[in-house]
Amino acid sequence: MPDSGNIQLDTLQHKDHSQETTSHYEGGSQLPEQESLDTNIQDDSVEYPGLIRVILITMGVALCSFCVGLDNTILATAIPKITSEFNSLEDMSWYVSAYLLVTSAFILSFGKIYTYYSVKWTYLISLGLFELGSLICAITPSSAGLIVGRAISGLGSAGLFPGSVIILSNIAPLHQRPLLTAFIGIMSGIATVTGPILGGVFTDRLSWRWCFYINLPIGGVTAVVVFLFMKTMKVKKNVPTSQKIKGLDWIGTAVFIPAIVSLLLALQWGGARYNWQNVRIIMLFIIAGVLGMVWLLIQRWKKEEATIPPRLMQRRSVVGTCIYTIPFVGCVIVLGYYLPIWFQSVKGVSASQSGIMNLPTVVGTIVVGLLSSVLIMRVGYMMPFLVLGSVMLAVGAGLCSTFQRSSGSAEWIGYQAMIGMGAGLGYQLPLLVVQADVPAADVPVATAVVIFMQNLAGSIFSAIAQTVFQNQLANSVQILAPSVNPESILDGGTVDLSDRFPSDVLPSILQAYNTAVTHTFYAGVAAASLSVFGAFIVRWNVSVKKKVPPEPLVPGGSHSGAERDSKNGT
């Protein structure tokens, strides 16, 4: 007897395309159903939760996304106090790197774990790891303990990133997910922007340890909500444990982790700790390249047991979203990082004031993100919104590249609003595209791939922007203020410039900073423009409203992968 608090799914002939359940080897040979996957809806007797449960679960997951977003940026204003307390200036970069490296290294692995094991319990275990890491960071008496805690939190966040999106696919049909996904993305975006402000408040008023204590009660609320209100769907247990373990691709993971760690270390250290020609950076890139090629060969060899099954990357929309995501998110990262630097260095405001001046971007993202979600729920198609998001983001970045020292509030408010609208249109859509395009059994891996690309974009474009900024700043200082040593500029930071330089050279220094920052926005313009090509690769008819009959699961009645793609317009 169905629970009265639940909503019955549509009839069998109206199931979402995202609820397909058949997987195939290359060439069309059939694989066993992956019926252990929570998101793999088997028949029309399965029920989605009722409205109250959907709201509670979404709010719980959104709170967790807020915590994860905070952890990405909250230490920006707290690190000086931490290094002073621990007397550990040499460890400073590891407070951020330990978290980022572990998160990026394990995101794809969690995509496979979510494929074979309960979404609910995998998410709760990931949340437990994140909370444990936060607790260690909050109470640690040493710098080493803080680094270990950050690494453990990073491992947990690797499961929370894709888990949040996968949970939404468990609690709502595809055509209702745009609004839920937008809400999750907005909470994460707000946390990313407000993180440095909260970090400064905690550090000045309480203690830097509250940057981590704050995660404990919020994560606790999420854990209670998910545990009580999210049900593990009934599925047939016909996948042997040995096959599940084998399907986690241990060989591929063992090669992928050192490959991605080498790449990220090269991107983080290059131009900062060492110059790009340093033998350490060159060797890291070589190691990353060689291991990356080995990993690709392993994926081809393992086929369906690979971390990313090759057939998944043969789908136009998956490839398109990856090509779209890297430059699009890269542009958002560059603008999000260097707009506050422009406010603080050129306009001379404090960190908290720069956060307030950054609100037009936040408001634009929230408003347009919600409005576009409602529109997508009505029209279904997403490709036009991807293109429009890229265009608006590129225009906004281009307008910001015209900033001058004399630029007034009308300019920086209006230009940021354009950036926010572009980000609101395109940031979360790739996650919906892959959910609408791939079979349900592939949703966890496809989701993890997109989120991994988002993380990778941050590392790549942060390194590019940092190189552009530092080189342009040094060149501008040599031209505009030849009496000033460029090294002292680079080592001194971007704040309190009026206190560090005499009045006769200060205008030249401010102009040099303005030139350096606006040149980084050129990289944002190029990135946003490139993302348009990815949007056009995505199939135009991928829709959150499109209903197709499920493929037959009996031998002789199933379609080959190529036939299925042809039917769906791939």
UniProtKB/Swiss-Prot annotation:
This is MFS-type transporter ptmT. Pfam families: MFS_1. InterPro entries: MFS, MFS_dom, MFS_trans_sf. The chain crosses the membrane at residues 50-70, 94-114, 121-141, 151-171, 182-202, 210-230, 247-267, 278-298, 323-343, 356-376, 379-399, 413-433, 445-465, 517-537. Keywords: Cell membrane, Glycoprotein, Membrane, Transmembrane, Transmembrane helix, Transport. One of its GO terms (cellular component) is plasma membrane. Residues 561-570 have a biased composition (Basic and acidic residues). Coiled coil: none annotated. It is found in: Cell membrane. Residues 1-34, 550-570 are annotated as: Disordered. Residues 1-11 have a biased composition (Polar residues).
